Amino acid sequence: MTNADNINEPRLIVETGLDQRIAAIIEPVIVGMDYRLVRVRLMNQNGLTLQVMAERNDGSMNVQGCEEISTAISPVLDVEDPVDKAYHLEVSSPGIDRPMVRKSDFVRWNGHIVKCETSILVDNRKRFRGKITDVNDDGFTIERDQVAYGEEPKVTIPFSTLAEAKLILTDDLIRDALRADKQAKAEAANQNEADEEE
């Protein structure tokens, strides 16, 4: 899957209610800046906080990107005024233990531990935790890290049943996330050098 495909890739897990309305307002702005919306959540934290998670198409994000998005979406939110109370706008990266909201997230983080919940029973459960071992167009397979008596060690979870999913912080995840960030920075530096030569 290329970065061009990633920007148009739909999210598997989307907001509801007011969060959904806010996402509909800001997502076109974020996509127009070559970023992807990960999640919107209005929380009762420090008064009222509107948390917006976004990332570049390659999955990276830095403070400058957060500032750019905040500057771009703030006036749009002021005009549309979806929240009828004062709130703090917080734009951030999804972080290392990120929410998994697109199929490409599962492909990218294959081999890492995910915790997820389904909207219906899958293999007589709704909550799962384990290492992602396979991903296809219809779902992903995890190897459970705690197998109950009578359960198979591996379970395939259809994307259509997914209600929530996030990576679990491990040493391997930190190592791979730092490696991916270093690679993204090197590619950005190479692109800047190529642009300067032209």
UniProtKB/Swiss-Prot annotation:
Alphabetical GO biological process terms: ribosomal small subunit assembly; translation
InterPro entries referenced in this protein's UniProt entry, alphabetically: Ribosome_maturation_RimP, RimP_C, RimP_C_sf, RimP_N, RimP_N_sf
Subcellular compartments: Cytoplasm
CDD domains: YlxS_C
Superkingdom, taxonomy of origin: Bacteria
Entry keyword set: Cytoplasm, Ribosome biogenesis
GO cellular component: cytosol
Function: Required for maturation of 30S ribosomal subunits.
PANTHER family: RIBOSOME MATURATION FACTOR RIMP
Family assignment from sequence similarity: Belongs to the RimP family.
Stated name of the protein: Ribosome maturation factor RimP
Organism: Rhizobium rhizogenes (strain K84 / ATCC BAA-868)
